[in-house]
Every structure is written in structure tokens, then in C-alpha cells.
Swiss-Prot record:
Gene: tsf
Subcellular location: Cytoplasm
Keyword Ribosomal protein applies: no
Family under the similarity heading: Belongs to the EF-Ts family.
Protein name: Elongation factor Ts
CDD domains xref list: UBA_EF-Ts
KW Transcription (keyword) present: no
Function of the protein: Associates with the EF-Tu.GDP complex and induces the exchange of GDP to GTP. It remains bound to the aminoacyl-tRNA.EF-Tu.GTP complex up to the GTP hydrolysis stage on the ribosome.
Region (Involved in Mg(2+) ion dislocation from EF-Tu): 80-83
A single Gene Ontology CC term: cytoplasm
One function term, GO molecular function aspect: translation elongation factor activity
């Protein structure tokens, strides 16, 4: 008679993200002891960690922490949405986020190298990799500060954790505007805050492409400069937050929205899990 039930298998899968057969075998070997089964999965899973290095971690979640004028965001990637929504992976994300806040991490490299209870965060991820049987990464960390920081998390499905996260720093406290701009940023995916933030070489590349395209379209030479400038401005509208049409009211821009509220965005960050 089996020393475990179907509910035990389900619970072990939810805790670890490991495959069903692996969970069954671990429960058999541990004689139904769930904690021992988790340890067995870690030990056996460690052997396959190297093989998982080349696999694609295109799922995951984004977690955020805000406290007044501070915002911290971490991105965790895994291979499948099954693991992404598992209790073990979600708990891991909270551990990583708490550590990012505690050590004031500003990038993934410093966070992964930081000490967490006698081991590094990277070693914690390696253990999770072994237990869950998937490649797990923390590719990005953001830490922004301002007078007020707003956050927004977006779910693509109700049964999955948030996969898009945004932090927006303002120079004044305004929850409504902060939330509106954060939601807009999640939807419209700007790359830069102002056009001055766009690298000069990128602007020159867009200008060159616009001119070459216009010439291929046989646009009149007399109108060339105006056409090129218009297309470069379109690039700014697509990629610069302050110049984008506001998602909730395209007749106004983010700049005008902020001006009407008397606030400024000083910085922002947007992550998408799996990217």
C-alpha cells in the first residue's frame, strides 16, 4: 500500500514545482515524509542543474516592495507557468525581494552575491533549481527613490502571478497620478523617461532609417527634412514616457497629465517576467 495519497503528491508539487513522477518517487523513497521528500528532490535535482543551464527560462513573476519614497522590484524567471504559480516559487520570490530590500541591491549581480543566512542568494537559487527541476534566474533588480513611489503589478491570467511590474517615482505625493502612470507604463512599455535620455547614436540611427525609407518611397526632396523629423518624433512618442499619449485618454500626453496635477516623474522601471 502506498505511503502517500494523491493529495500528498499535489501538495508536494505545489511546494516544489517538481514533476508528478519525481514527486511520487520521492514520496515512496521517503515513506510519505513530505519534508524528507523535498530534501530528496533537492539532492537528485542537483545532478540535473548543469543540464538545465541551456534551457529557456521564459516564464516567472515580478515582485515589488514600496515604502513611501522607496521602491524595489525583482524579476524571477523560470521555465513553465506551473512552477511560476507554485507555492515554492512564490515563497522564493518573496525571500529574494526581502533580501534586495535589506541589502539595498541596485542590480542582480550584487543581490546574487549577497549573504542570506550563511549562503548567497545564488546558492539559494541553485537549491531551488534542483528542487523544482527548472532553470531559475534573477535577471534584473531595480531600486528607485523619490518623494513618492507608486507600483503596479499586472497579471495576464487570474491563476498566474504578476508577470509585469512597474515602479514610478514622483517628486510629490499623489497616489492617483502615480497609479495612473504606472498602469500606463505597464501597458505602453516606454524605454526612456525623456527624449534627452535616448542615446544620441539611437536618435541618429532612427533619423538615418527615416531618411532612407523616405527616399525609397520617392518622397519629394523639398519635404524630406520635415518627413524625417516627423518620423523621428513618432519614435519618441512610441518610446519616451513623457511624450506618449496617455493610455486612458489618448488626447492628452503624459507630460500634460503630470502638468495638470503639478507633479513630475523623476524615474521609472518596468520589468516583464521571461524577458
Amino acid at each position: 500500500m502506498a505511503a502517500y495519497t494523491a493529495a500528498d503528491v499535489k501538495a508536494l508539487r505545489e511546494k516544489t514545482g517538481a514533476g508528478m513522477l519525481d514527486c511520487k518517487n520521492a514520496l515512496v523513497e521517503s515513506e510519505g515524509d513530505v519534508e524528507k521528500a523535498i530534501e530528496l528532490l533537492r539532492i537528485k535535482g542537483q545532478k540535473g542543474v548543469a543540464k538545465r543551464e541551456d534551457r529557456d527560462a521564459s516564464n516567472g513573476l515580478v515582485a515589488v516592495h514600496t515604502d513611501g519614497g522607496l521602491g524595489v522590484m525583482v524579476q524571477l524567471n523560470c521555465e513553465t507557468d506551473f512552477v511560476a504559480k507554485s507555492e515554492g516559487f512564490i515563497a522564493l520570490s518573496q525571500q529574494v525581494l526581502d533580501q534586495a530590500v535589506a541589502v539595498a541591491a541596485t542590480d542582480a549581480e550584487s543581490l546574487l552575491a549577497s549573504d542570506l543566512g550563511g549562503r548567497t542568494v545564488q546558492e539559494l537559487l541553485d537549491e531551488a533549481n534542483a528542487t523544482m527541476g527548472e532553470k531559475i534566474l534573477v535577471p534584473r533588480v531595480a531600486r528607485i527613490e523619490g518623494t513618492h513611489v507608486s507600483a503596479y503589478l499586472h497579471r495576464t491570467a487570474t491563476d498566474l502571478p504578476p508577470t509585469i511590474g512597474v515602479l514610478v517615482a514622483l517628486d510629490a505625493v499623489n497616489d492617483e497620478i502615480g497609479k495612473d502612470v504606472a498602469m500606463h507604463t505597464a501597458a505602453m512599455s516606454p524605454t526612456y523617461l525623456t527624449r534627452e535620455d535616448v542615446p544620441a547614436e539611437k536618435v541618429e540611427s532612427e533619423r538615418r532609417i527615416a531618411e532612407e525609407t523616405a527616399r525609397e518611397e520617392n518622397k519629394p526632396e523639398a519635404a524630406m527634412a520635415k518627413i524625417v523629423e516627423g518620423r523621428v518624433n513618432s519614435y519618441f512618442k512610441d518610446n519616451v514616457l513623457l511624450e506618449q499619449p496617455f493610455a486612458k485618454d489618448p488626447k492628452t500626453t503624459i507630460t500634460k497629465l503630470l502638468a495638470g496635477a503639478g507633479v513630475h516623474v523623476t524615474s521609472f522601471a518596468r520589468f516583464r517576467a521571461g524577458a
